[in-house]
Amino acid sequence: MIKNTAKNKNGIITRATIDLKKDLKFVKLTAVSNLAVQNGEMLAAVTEKLLVHYSEGTGERHQEMSLPLNGPDHVAYIHLSRTGFHAIVSSKLGHNFYIHLKSNAFHHLKKLRCVVTAVGWNPDYSKETDTTGPILLGTAQGSIIELNVGSTGMMTTLKELTSQVAQIAEQRITSAPSPAAAITDIQLFQLADDDPKNKKWMVIIAQMARLIVLITDNEPAPVVKLGGFTSSASLQAGLMNLATEQAPSTTFHSFFTSPNTLQHTISSSKFSEKFKNHGFLTMHPTIAEPKRYAWLSPDGISIGNVNIYAERIQDVLVEEFNIEHRLIEGRLEPPTGIALTDYHVLLAYSSRVLALSLLPPHDVIFEDPWNPELGGALGFVSDNVAEFVWLYTQTFAMKYGTNDEARYIWKTYLDRGEYQKALQIARTRVAIEPDALEMVLRKQADFYIQEKNFTAAAEILAQSSEPFESVVLKFLTNSSERKMGLKTLLDKKLERLTRHEDKIRRDALVMWLLNVQLEELAEMRRLKNSNPDPAFVEKLRDTTDHVQRYFMRKNVIESIQTNRDAVYRMCVAHADFEMQLFFANAVKDLRTVIDILMLREQYFEVLEVLKNQRISELTYEMCPLLIEHIPKQVIVYLIQNQDQISPQKLTPCLSLCVKNMEMAIPAIKYLEAQFKGTQTISQNPQNLANLHNIYIHLMAKFRREKLLGYLESHGTIRSDLPYELDFAMRTCEQFKIEPCVVYLFCVAGMFGDAVEKALGFDVDLAKKCALMMEEAEANFAWLEGMEDPAATSYIRQKLDEKAKKAIWLKIGQYYVTQENNVDKCIELINESNHLLTIQDLLPIIPKFTRVGALKPIIVDFLKRNKQRLEKLERSMKEATEIASEIRDKQEKLKNRTTVVKPSDVCSHCARPISGRAFNVHSCRHFFHRECLEIAMISFLSQEEVEKMKTLIIDEERVLSQMKAEQLAGNQKGFIEKQEKYLKIAAFISNIVGAECPLCGNIAISQIDKQFLSDEEFAADLNTWLL
């Protein structure tokens, strides 16, 4: 390996020199005549007929292939596919070979007799290893041939598409081949592959003095007639027998046969037969869609842009600049080869390589002269996949590559003011050179600020990492342009804050940006008052719409939701209720929406908001406020949603409807509609008491003539009333609706007050009230049977006969005193169902009333009294007989005795009763005295137990004293002690012998008590545990 002597100041271009004989072990090397490298696969002609295949990537030993060539023939051209799978080798005398580099097998293409100077590889078969696919061959005579050959060397397609491509360029055809006619390069592109049957293709064909661009669509291959005319060029190319065989189908024939083919030619203006170098065409990049081309022609080196998808074919290749050839000692010195990188063009001369910048002024940034012992340059080939360029001499190869060639390009663009290009490069170098991006951004922003384009400057600075405070200072003025820039800056900064950790900063930017927008809108509204121009009004509307759309973005609306109280305060500070209403709607803050609409007295809009939402507490809260302004609409809304609305919660709303007729009538309609829902009412009538009270109030004030019918429809049973009786009575008294007051008195059981009130205006109503006492009597029996005493607490004491008579007598007194009509007074006896008697009426009848009028009444009274007296006499007689019978039984009981048999046993201990003191009960249960005390102890109170224990002690003490007196012979003392002993025994008998402990009242009263206490039960339960 020879030491690198390249003069490269900045190290952008690198070179590695390889001695093919020593380093790659090409032992049979005499002189390299041709070399090609693609995708790391090298194929070199090391002698006139010996080829060497070397895989750079694998490092395996090279393979040698000897072609069947006879002198003076030798290898002239080697064409490698981009993948390095296929090779076409052409000799000086027109012999051609296909080499499959995977197997290192070569095949002689005997039917192809011409010098192949260029190959256009098919991009559709870029990954195919078994076949080349349809490809285009360019010859030294200027003809184009389509070939398809497989890995076995079998040609499925071989057809000459045109004998002279110069015909397309309308150039003069010469019979003899010349350097100008030879095809130097073919670039094949597929433009559309959506429809595999109708693909669009482009081919760029290069000759020494011209470039030809053709675009066509696929068409079916033409039918070739057998035995046709064969051109002289074809004869020279050895293709004379192709027309006599069945012509295979071709793919690219339409380039040269279709009338729809588009073509464009670029020609050199300084063509000279003395220009002996072949023209070279190279493009970059070659793997993807090419963007730039370089063409070596007699005019110089043309460098320009490539756009294979251009609308006009003339715009496919557009020259950017041309580098003229240098004259040395009066003759041209064209390069041996050219190659393109991203930002440089490499020119290979016989003893040096130059790298020129593609940017003006196209300075030489790299020069690499090499030692003469390396030999002169024979060729300059590019490895399109590996992006290396190979220069070769007879025994050496030099491998050129790039090393971060964009490191100074961005500065060049920046100095020239091409900020977008500089920015594009700087972004790709952020990891390598982060300061580059910052410098470009600042320079571009400063340029925009100088141009007063603050919006563009803000967009640029938002991408910069310059401290936010220093950036903002550039826009903090009262200038409208700078304010627009500030808005843009805040907006762009906000777009970049997408992480969860940036929430605080995002909220701050949203609030700041909102404040700026509100200030702008406030200023525009102020100017609108002094400028009623419709265009300005439309501008204000558009600005408002723009602001609203902007703040509806997801990250912005989330911040507004979080800080909505601060947003509301900001809107209020700018008096912008429109925006506040917009934000409230955006975050679904219904309360604020309604508050703003109520403040603006937009009551119908408030109702619409409630209609669009589910029934909630807000509905019940707003109805009292709305019903004062739009009562009809509110009531219609309530009726339409009565299934979802709780009527009890509407009490405050309906209570307000007593103010005027306009509100009352809709409220009455709603309540009537609600009362018709019998199912709802029957579930819990008491819950609707307030609604019925409101209804009574409304009816009493605005529909008093219908109130009595409503009250009567609910009956007189107080427990069934849906309204509060006391409230109804007060309301009717307040509005002086006397028939309703009388009716309610009757419902309340205040018949005396009802009759007294009714006598003031209607005596018939008074009698009707008196008759209602009988209905109350029937209902009272039902009410007395209720289990809950509290439920009957409102019922007055049952009226006795005397009270009823007093009420009827008030009516009779009215007839006598007010109407002076004794006959009607006497008729009350029948009307009261004979509750009144003539005796009751006599005190109020005037003294001088004729007896004749009273005679039928008196006779009837005596008849009824006679029966009653006879019944009373019979009852007294029966009572006397029963009393006598009871007295006789009592006398007999005084002499009753009980006989005790010797076989009778104690009911407690089951032992014979005789032998010890015992007690006998009338139920024939016998107990020893001690057993009775034990049996009765559980029925006695603590006080009685203590008393009995004391008496037993006294009894034992007196008994011992009595025995002592007896032994002493003191008869008198013995009698005294005996009497005392009997008294104590009598006291004990009264305590324990009052009732039988087994069947007496005391035992019956203890029947619901447990046999065992909780402690006893637990103790007994433990005895059963194993």
UniProtKB/Swiss-Prot annotation:
Tissue: In hermaphrodites, expressed in coelomocytes and gonadal sheath cells.
Annotated phenotype, changing residue 925 to A: Fails to rescue the defects in germ cell corpse clearance in the vps-18 (tm1125) deletion mutant
Classification via Pfam families: Pep3_Vps18
Protein name, as recorded: Vacuolar protein sorting-associated protein 18 homolog
Keyword set, alphabetical order: Autophagy, Coiled coil, Cytoplasm, Cytoplasmic vesicle, Endosome, Lysosome, Membrane, Metal-binding, Transport, Zinc, Zinc-finger
GO biological process: autophagy; endosome organization; endosome to lysosome transport; lysosome organization; organelle fusion; phagosome-lysosome fusion involved in apoptotic cell clearance; regulation of vacuole fusion, non-autophagic; vacuole fusion, non-autophagic
Effect of mutating residue 923 to A: Fails to rescue the defects in germ cell corpse clearance in the vps-18 (tm1125) deletion mutant
Disruption phenotype: Temperature-sensitive defects in the formation of gut granules during embryogenesis. At 15 degrees Celsius, pretzel-stage embryos have a reduced number of gut granules in intestinal cells, and at 22 degrees Celsius, pretzel-stage embryos completely lack gut granules in intestinal cells. At 25 degrees Celsius, many embryos arrest by the pre-bean stage before elongation, and 76% of these embryos contain gut granules irregularly distributed throughout the embryo. Defective apoptotic germ cell corpse digestion with delayed degradation of chromatin in late germ cell corpses.
Cellular compartment(s): Cytoplasm; Late endosome membrane; Lysosome membrane; Early endosome
Listed GO MF terms: protein-macromolecule adaptor activity; zinc ion binding
Zn-finger segments (RING-type): 906-932
Membrane topology, from the record: Peripheral membrane protein
Coiled coil, from the record: 858-896
